[in-house]
């Protein structure tokens, strides 16, 4: 973890234990505990100027271009990145962001979720990162994520002629909260359907591309 939202900083210490406590999601109205595991590629953190709030960004590195889409989250797909982000920000995991003195932050809030992948080289042959995702529309957060003013690591955001930032990657705190609700609803609905015996296949180019049993499934993707 870094003490800023600058991905050029040092990563977390491999000798430390950063295991997350799971966020419980109840399926239907039964006492069914859903445990979803995974490994986060990168976590960046920023201690706000108020001294009480920690903001978190998660970064998922991809070998090829990968677009962030709110629609895919609403369609119960592509939820992994947001699941990491909101699990990190849950009260159960606040101890991960304790100060050296042991003091815990009053709040741990989501700042950004980013897919990063290599893109075409520029004219000088340097590899340019391709990034998509969301970032909180807050000057303090944007400045922390963009300390050298290059916009290299801001997802789908650009600086306008007036000096302000624009782009589809910007979102406010209310939309972040809405995304968390959408995410938990998607997980809950999918789990409830599975426990009720419904396990219909949902073919798509993305869902079936790496499936190990697609040859025997009978699904035809055009």
Ranges and model annotations:
Residues 1-222:
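RecB-family 4Fe-4S metal-dependent nuclease core
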């Amino acid at each position: 973890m870094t003490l800023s939202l600058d991905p050029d900083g040092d990563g977390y210490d491999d000798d430390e234990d950063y295991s997350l406590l799971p966020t419980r999601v109840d399926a239907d109205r039964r006492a069914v505990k859903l445990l979803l595991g995974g490994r986060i590629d990168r976590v960046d953190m920023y201690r706000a100027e108020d001294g009480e709030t920690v903001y978190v960004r998660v970064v998922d590195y991809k070998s090829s271009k990968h677009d962030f889409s709110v629609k895919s989250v609403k369609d119960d797909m592509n939820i992994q990145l947001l699941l990491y982000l909101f699990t990190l920000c849950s009260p159960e995991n606040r101890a991960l962001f304790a100060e050296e003195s042991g003091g815990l932050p009053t709040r741990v809030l989501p700042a950004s979720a980013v897919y990063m992948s290599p893109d075409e080289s520029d004219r000088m042959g340097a590899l340019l990162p391709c990034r998509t995702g969301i970032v909180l529309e807050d000057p303090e957060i944007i400045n922390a994520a963009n300390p050298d003013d290059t916009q290299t690591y801001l997802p789908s955001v650009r600086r306008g002629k007036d000096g302000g930032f624009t782009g589809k990657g910007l979102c406010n705190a209310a939309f972040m909260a809405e995304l968390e609700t959408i995410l938990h609803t998607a997980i809950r609905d999918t789990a409830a359907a599975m426990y009720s015996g419904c396990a219909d296949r949902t073919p798509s180019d993305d869902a079936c591309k790496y499936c190990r049993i697609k040859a025997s499934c009978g699904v035809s993707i055009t």
